C-alpha cells in the first residue's frame, strides 16, 4: 500500500497491475470514511473503535482548528454509534453507513446543535466537496494499491488523509484474518 502525494508511483502501480485510487473531492472515486470491518478479532469492540475514528474525522472536517466542542462531540458520537449498532444488528453486509446517513441521523435529532452539525456537513454531502459521501466504489483489495492524494488540498487534506489511513487500517484487519501482512509506504510523510 502506497500513499502518494505527488503522483510518483502511478506508473509503477500500472506496470505491476496495481490499483490506483485517486482521492479528491472532484473525482467519481468514492472511499467511504464510514466503512467498518465488524470481523475484528482483537479484544476491542470494532463499533466503539470506529465510532471514535469517525468522531475524530468529523472534528477535522467541520470542527476547524479547535475541533468539536464536548457537546458536539457527544452528539456525533451518539449518532455514529447508533448507525453502527443498527448496521451490526442487521448483520453487516455490503451497504455500509455513509456521511449521508450521519447527516440524516443528526438532522433527526431536532435540537439546535444537531441541526447545526447537520448543516455544517451539507457541503460534504451534496456540495462541491461531496467526494467522500457514498459507498466505496473502488477495489481496495489489490495487493499493490496506491492512494493518489495529490488532489487533496485545503480543508479536505487532513480529513482525506484520515480516511486513507482508516482504510489502510481496515485492510490490516482483513489481512490479519487471512494471515497476510501488508506493507505501507507513505511518501513525503513529513508533509
Residue ranges and their predicted role:
Residues 1:
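Glycine-rich phosphate-binding P-loop
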Amino acid at each position: 500500500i502506497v500513499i502518494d502525494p505527488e503522483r510518483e508511483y502511478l506508473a509503477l502501480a500500472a506496470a505491476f497491475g496495481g490499483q490506483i485510487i485517486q482521492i479528491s473531492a472532484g473525482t467519481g472515486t468514492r472511499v467511504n470514511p464510514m466503512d467498518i470491518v465488524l470481523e475484528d478479532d482483537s479484544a476491542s469492540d470494532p463499533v466503539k473503535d470506529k465510532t471514535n475514528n469517525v468522531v475524530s474525522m468529523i472534528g477535522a472536517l467541520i470542527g476547524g482548528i479547535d475541533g468539536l466542542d464536548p457537546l458536539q462531540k457527544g452528539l456525533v458520537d451518539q449518532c455514529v454509534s447508533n448507525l453502527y449498532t443498527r448496521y451490526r444488528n442487521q448483520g453487516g453486509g455490503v451497504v455500509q453507513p455513509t456521511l449521508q446517513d450521519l447527516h440524516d441521523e443528526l438532522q433527526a435529532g431536532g435540537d439546535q446543535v444537531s441541526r447545526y452539525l447537520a448543516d455544517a456537513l451539507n457541503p460534504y454531502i451534496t456540495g462541491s466537496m461531496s467526494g467522500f459521501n457514498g459507498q466505496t466504489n473502488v477495489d481496495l483489495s489489490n495487493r499493490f494499491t496506491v492512494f493518489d492524494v495529490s488532489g487533496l488540498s485545503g480543508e479536505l487534506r487532513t480529513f482525506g488523509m484520515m480516511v486513507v489511513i482508516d482504510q489502510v487500517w481496515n485492510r490490516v484487519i482483513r489481512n490479519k484474518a487471512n494471515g497476510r501482512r501488508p506493507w505501507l509506504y507513505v511518501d513525503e510523510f513529513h508533509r
